[in-house]
C-alpha cells in the first residue's frame, strides 16, 4: 500500500491509500469518495503531465508519499 497526497490549491488536501497496481481511474474514484465530487470531473497532474485513467500508478512511477495536483473540470 502506498499513500498519495492530492492538493487542489484551494485549501483541500486529500490523502489516499492505494496499491501501485491500481489505475489512475481507481485513484480518482477513491479521491471522489473522500471529496464528494464525481470522479469524471477530477483531473490529476504533476507539473504539466496530465495522468490518463487506464494507466497504472507504477507505470507513471507514482510512489509512496508523492504529491499530485488535483484539478476539477
UniProtKB/Swiss-Prot annotation:
InterPro entries: Hub1/Ubl5, Ubiquitin-like_dom, Ubiquitin-like_domsf. Keywords: Cytoplasm, Ubl conjugation pathway. It comes from the Eukaryota. Pfam families: Ubiquitin_2. One of its GO terms (cellular component) is cytoplasm. Its main location: cytoplasm. GO terms for molecular function: protein tag activity. One of its GO terms (biological process) is protein modification process. Residues 1-73 form the Ubiquitin-like domain. It is found in: Cytoplasm. The keyword Glycosyltransferase does not apply. PROSITE patterns: UBIQUITIN_2. This is Ubiquitin-like protein 5.
Amino acid at each position: 500500500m502506498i499513500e498519495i497526497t492530492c492538493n487542489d490549491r484551494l485549501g483541500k488536501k486529500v490523502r489516499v491509500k492505494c496499491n501501485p497496481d491500481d489505475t489512475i481511474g481507481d485513484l480518482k474514484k477513491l479521491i471522489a469518495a473522500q471529496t464528494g465530487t464525481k470522479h469524471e470531473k477530477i483531473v490529476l497532474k504533476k507539473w504539466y503531465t496530465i495522468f490518463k485513467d487506464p494507466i497504472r500508478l507504477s507505470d507513471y512511477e507514482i510512489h509512496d508519499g508523492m504529491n499530485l495536483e488535483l484539478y476539477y473540470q
